[in-house]
Design a protein with these regions (language model features):
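Short, compositionally biased P/S/T/A/G/V-rich stretches that sit at domain boundaries
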Residues: 282-300, 310
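VWA/integrin I-like adhesion module and closely mimicked acidic/polar interface patches used
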Residues: 7, 11, 62-70, 75, ...
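C-terminal "exit" segments of structured domains
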Residues: 162-259, 265-271, 276-286
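Beta-strand-rich structural segments
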Residues: 302-317, 327-329
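Von Willebrand factor
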Residues: 1-47, 77-80, 94-99, 137-139
Length: 341
């Protein structure tokens, strides 16, 4: 309920939809938990299926900020923890909280008080921390009244992060910091410009063959329809029909997801509404695993050991030297009995 004032432009909805579209298309699931005077969960949906992503975004579009002011943060966080408890134990698990940071319980709500909700916030934080679930908080501050201290505490207690945002442009960097921890992603700023009604051409480079997905994120205050993409061979890509491209757009953003993009220089042309400020980012993730081969089965302190370390992608050893440039690493050996390192 309090989001009616803090998020008049429905930034939370646009940001959550952008996150859904940016999420990788393999080995990932997303659940939506909506909380007001009651909690509604979509359950975990596999993001490898486009229809599931569309379903999640339809649910988000249907969210209404209605009076009276109900924001039961504690109940929402407890439900989010419960949803993650039932997910695949092998995957990294995170909670992303979109909120104005205010917990509001209407005075007429039976058997529920603000104190109850705040106690549940603390319980959820403790459970998340114990289970290794990081909580990332996005504080929506359109009315300047965000409870930053609450968000800082939630994030710090679970080894997460928080971000205060007034515009969707504030969020791709923050999203990338999340993806960097769970999806091995990197971000590049391609360009930003004020639209003049003509096409604005930009270039970006895919510099190695192990990029699994590349997300071109176009942020604007008005919806963009005219986008042209050209691959390194100079061929224009049909962004609506090409099987290696997924195109999504909404009120505040457009997103092109390129699957296993070709190495080389790409170009993109964007035509926006005159006067609109447009920002274009590239966020990409790798399909890479680290393989360590050790000759010795017994390690003796003070004795030399031989080991080989490789990067693998799609089951094959990576030989692309560009990926190995500027890499460094360290090895820790620990005695299982004494715990000495």
């Amino acid at each position: 309920g309090s989001m009616r004032k803090a998020d008049k432009e429905r930034l939370a909805i646009e940001a959550a939809k952008l996150f859904v579209d940016m999420e990788k298309t393999s080995n990932a699931s997303i659940a939506l938990v909506e909380f007001s005077n009651k909690v509604v969960s979509s359950g975990l949906l596999d993001t490898s299926q486009q229809e599931n992503k569309n379903q999640l975004k339809e649910v988000l579009d249907g969210v209404r900020y209605s009076a009276p002011a109900h924001t039961d943060t504690g109940a929402g966080l407890l439900e989010a923890v419960s949803v993650l408890d039932g997910s695949d134990v092998r995957n990294e698990k995170v909670i992303i909280l979109f909120t104005d940071g205010k917990t509001d319980i209407d005075a007429g709500t039976p058997n529920r008080t603000i104190e109850d909700s705040l106690n549940d916030v603390n319980t959820a934080i403790q459970e998340a921390a114990q289970k290794g679930y990081k909580i990332y908080c996005i504080g929506l501050n359109a009315d300047g009244k965000v409870d930053e201290e609450m968000l800082r505490n939630i994030a710090a207690s679970t080894d997460g992060q928080y971000k205060i945002a007034t515009d969707v442009n504030d969020l791709p960097d923050f999203f990338n910091s999340i993806f960097a921890q769970i999806d091995k992603s990197e971000k590049q700023n391609i360009d930003e410009f004020d639209a003049d009604g003509n096409y604005h051409e930009m270039h970006f480079t895919i510099d190695n063959s192990s990029v699994m997905e590349a997300n071109i994120v176009i942020l604007s205050s008005m919806q963009i329809e005219d986008i042209c993409l050209t691959d390194p061979s100079g061929t224009e890509v049909d962004i609506q029909e090409n099987a290696r491209v997924e195109f999504n757009n909404s009120a505040k953003y457009s997103l092109l997801k390129l699957f296993t993009p070709d190495v080389g220089e790409w170009s993109i042309k964007v035509k926006g509404v005159t006067g609109d400020h447009i920002k274009v980012n590239l966020i990409y993730n790798y399909d890479i695993d680290l393989i360590v081969e050790v000759e010795n089965t017994v390690v003796v302190k003070g004795k030399k050991i031989n080991l080989q370390v490789y990067l693998y992608s799609r089951g094959e050893k990576i030989t692309d030297k560009a990926i190995y440039q500027n890499m460094s690493g360290y090895l820790t050996i620990q005695n299982k009995n004494s715990q000495e390192q």
